[in-house]
Amino acid sequence: MTVTLNLSRPNSALPGKKRLTGLSVPALKAEMEALGLEPKAANMRARQIRRWIHHFGTTDFAAMTDIAKDLRAQLAEKFEVERPEIADHQVSRDGTQKWLTRYGPGIEGESVYIPDVGKAGALCVSSQVGCTLNCTFCHTGTQALVRNLTAAEIVQQVIIARDALSEWPSSIEERRLTNIVFMGMGEPLYNLDNVAEAIDTISDGDGMAIGRRRITVSTAGVAPKIPELGERTGAMLAISLHATNNDLRNELVPLNRKYDIQTLFDAIRAYPGLGNAKRVTFEYVMLKGINDTLAEARDLVKLMKGVPSKINLIPFNPWPGSPYECSDWETIEEFAEVLNRAGYASPIRTPRGRDILAACGQLRSESVKVRASELRKQQASAEGAES
C-alpha cells in the first residue's frame, strides 16, 4: 500500500530574506562580506554557518552558539535557514521515498531515497527541472526543460532526505543515506558548474561528509564534458548507454546523433583516475524486442573492451503512455550471463518505488517553462495573498 505523507513546509524563502541552506562555503563567505565583514572574518563565519547547517542540520540561527549574539540577530534579520517547500512526499511499500520539492512558483523537482543500495542507501538527486534530451524510454524526457537547479537546490535535496531519515549530525554511525547518485531529472553535464559546486558541498568533511567515491554522476553522453567532470569533482562516472550501435542509440538517446558511440568511448577512456578501483558504470535498460538479444550482449562486451567497468541491467519501468515493454526476466538473465562469462559484473537492478513512479526513468514533475515576467507576477500575487 502506498502511503502519502503531508510534510509541506513554507514556500520559498521568507519575503526579503535569502535562504542560506545548501550554499557552499565560498557562497556563504560572499554573503558575509556583503554584511560588511572583513574577508578573514567572513571566511571564518561562513565555515561556522556551513557546519551548523550541513553537519548539524540546524534551522535556527539562535542555535549557532559559537557565533556572537549580535551577529546571529543580524543574520536572522537578513537570512533564513529553513528548507524549501515539500509539495509531496510519498513512501513506497518497499521503503523507497520520493519528494517533490517546490523551489519557487512553477519550479518543482523530484528526488528519491532508495534503501539497500551501496553501503546502506542512496539518494537519487535531480540536476534540472525537466530535460532537453528526449530519451524515448524516460518519463522525464517528456517534460521540457524548465531550468537548471542551483548548487544550493541540489544540496537541499540531500538535506530534506536527511531530515526524513533523522540523520543529523553527519557524524552519526550506521547512516542509512551513504551514497548520492545524479540520476534524477535532467542531464548533469549540462549543468556542470552547479553540479560540481554541489558535490564540493556534499563531500565537505566538516559538513555532510559523503565521500566523492560515494557520489556517482550519470550522463547520457555529453562527451566533451566527461573528462572535465572527473577533473572537477572526482566523482564516479555512469553512462546511460542502452544500445551498442549508433542506429539504435540515435533512436533511444537522441544525443547520440551529436556525440556518437566512438566519440563517447574516447571521452570515457580520458576520464581521470579510471581503473579497477574506479570503474565506469554502464546503465542498460532492457527493452523487450528492442535491445535485449544475446548478439547485443556480445556486442556490449566488445564495446567495453579495455574500459574498467560494470554494467547495471535495468528492467524497464513503465510510465503512463510509455511505448516500450520490459524484457522477459529469462531474457534479462541470459543477457547478464553473457556479460558475466566475459568477466564483467552485471547486476540486474531490482525495481524500487514503481508504485509511486519513483523507479529509474519514471521521474517527472508538472513544472512547465514559464516566462520570467509571468513568474514575477505569480510571486507578487502569492506574496500579496500572504500579507
From Swiss-Prot:
UniProt cross-references to Gene3D superfamilies, sorted A to Z: 1.10.150.530, Aldolase class I
Pfam families in the cross-refs: Radical_SAM, RlmN_N
Keyword Nucleus (UniProt): no
Gene Ontology CC terms: cytoplasm
Cofactor note: Binds 1 [4Fe-4S] cluster. The cluster is coordinated with 3 cysteines and an exchangeable S-adenosyl-L-methionine.
Additional remarks: Reaction proceeds by a ping-pong mechanism involving intermediate methylation of a conserved cysteine residue.
Residues the record lists as binding [4Fe-4S] cluster: C131, C135, C138
InterPro entries in UniProt: Aldolase_TIM, Methyltransferase_A, RlmN_N, RNA_MTrfase_RlmN, rRNA_lsu_MTrfase_RlmN/Cfr, rSAM
NCBIfam families: rRNA_mod_RlmN (TIGR00048)
Domain of life from the UniProt record: Bacteria
GO MF terms held by the record: 4 iron, 4 sulfur cluster binding; metal ion binding; rRNA (adenine(2503)-C2-)-methyltransferase activity; rRNA binding; tRNA (adenine(37)-C2)-methyltransferase activity; tRNA binding
Main location: cytoplasm
Location of the Radical SAM core domain: 117-349
Protein name: Dual-specificity RNA methyltransferase RlmN
Residues that hold S-adenosyl-L-methionine according to the record: G186, E187, S218, S240, L241, H242, N317
Subcellular location: Cytoplasm
E.C. number(s) listed in UniProt: 2.1.1.192
Catalysed reaction, written as an equation: adenosine(2503) in 23S rRNA + 2 reduced [2Fe-2S]-[ferredoxin] + 2 S-adenosyl-L-methionine = 2-methyladenosine(2503) in 23S rRNA + 5'-deoxyadenosine + L-methionine + 2 oxidized [2Fe-2S]-[ferredoxin] + S-adenosyl-L-homocysteine; adenosine(37) in tRNA + 2 reduced [2Fe-2S]-[ferredoxin] + 2 S-adenosyl-L-methionine = 2-methyladenosine(37) in tRNA + 5'-deoxyadenosine + L-methionine + 2 oxidized [2Fe-2S]-[ferredoxin] + S-adenosyl-L-homocysteine
Family: Belongs to the radical SAM superfamily. RlmN family.
Keyword Oxidoreductase applies: no
Organism: Hyphomonas neptunium (strain ATCC 15444)
Function field: Specifically methylates position 2 of adenine 2503 in 23S rRNA and position 2 of adenine 37 in tRNAs. m2A2503 modification seems to play a crucial role in the proofreading step occurring at the peptidyl transferase center and thus would serve to optimize ribosomal fidelity.
